[in-house]
Amino acid sequence: GLPEPKGILLLGVPGCGKSLTAKCIASEWKQPLLKLDIGKVFQAEVGSSENNIRQALSTAEAIAPCVLWIDEIEKGLSTAGGERDGGTNSRVFSTILTWMQERKKPVFVVATANKIESLAPELLRKGRFDEIFFIDLPTPEERYNIFKIHLAKFHQYGIKNLDELVNNTRGF
């Protein structure tokens, strides 16, 4: 009896690991990962954008169970510009919100965003995502572990001073 999880929203600066997290979720759950590039949904022809988003969501439901990764969701799903684009942005946004609220198939949504202030409040309402997580840049200890994992295959080059690498990569 527990309800199916709907999805999560991952917030953080570019390069902090949001996309990798989306890929890891699908891999861990052994489910296909579908990437929805919001920027490619929008077309100049009247009605094309709305049709593109409906087709993308139908594809995800046909493949379900799966993970639908919506990368940089704020770039295409804002309520701004509804007048300038003939309302296309608003209609695409509405289509996605309705689908997120009413979908019946097990499609887990992992949306990523760089700026929470760019997101429409409707997207953050209860019922759209199960959780919203902020992913920060790695701490020195986390950077040390990342280097240790990725440089292990280069042990023959004698990279031994991981502490120096960690200290030289603040802000990364």
Language-model features and meaning:
Residues R170:
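A glycine-rich beta-turn/hairpin centered on an aromatic-Pro dipeptide
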Residues G1-N167:
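Walker A/P-loop NTP-binding motif of AAA+ ATPase domains
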